[in-house]
Amino acid sequence: MIRWVVYSLCSAGCFAAINPNDALSGWPEVHPPLNFKPKLPLPRGGLPPFHAPALQSPIDIRFSSAAKVILPPLEFEDLLNDGVRIIMRNTGTTVQFDVADNSVVRPTLMGGPLARHGVFQFSNLHVHWGTQDVLGGEHKVNSRRFAVEGHCVHFNTKYKTLEEAEKHEDGLSVVTFFAKAGNVDNPKLERLISLLPSIRYPNTSVSLTARDSLDWFADIGEPTNYFTYPGSLTTAPFTENVFWIIYPRPMFVSSRQVEAFRNLLSNELVENRVNARTVQPFNDRPLIYSV
């Protein structure tokens, strides 16, 4: 179980700063605007571990439960490097984009809530969707779900492999983005949509460059303006050792593009219409908004 040490919790549920000199003196405007009352911030620096009775994910991200905090900037490296090779495959439960074994370069992530925990290596992106465009995301944002939710899974490099990292409380981080469905196609996503029929059956795959396969969401990642909280994997084995990093501002895709994901076949050889887990109890864990 992941542990984020709680500095101190006041009776109103807000976070008290260890060092008042480290507290924010004002709340800068962010986009999209967050209409919630500011909480006392945590000190600057990466987040240490926290322990709670249950840290299952996904959750409903309520702005009223969040504390605005200055954290070190997130640093994404080599995500679209030409040396990164990606395998897009139908796992029977989702579309997954794995870094190929022969990839010369492997993207990394550091900073933010991970600053005290080292460098995290990108392992895969996988996608969640639902039967309807308003039911596709796993996390809710102020009780609202989106059409698509993407999870970029990273593992702490001190554990060498994803499988080993899953055994440790500081082993994993998942960067999350959302997509809202409308009438207009997302041109960056269209190449992938055109390839989905070639992996309609489970355990089929195609090889791509990182730019062809990951560019459709790369603009979402910023050094700040994200939520972070301690949670779990949303698929088996549901280990509670994930630093979640969630960008609330959605990108846009078309309903037609979302439907293309639903047309993929599951392990049971039926259309995979939904693969999103239900929201789990919040359990008063820390919820941070990085500014």
What residue spans do the PLM features occupy?
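Alpha-carbonic anhydrase
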Residues: 2-291
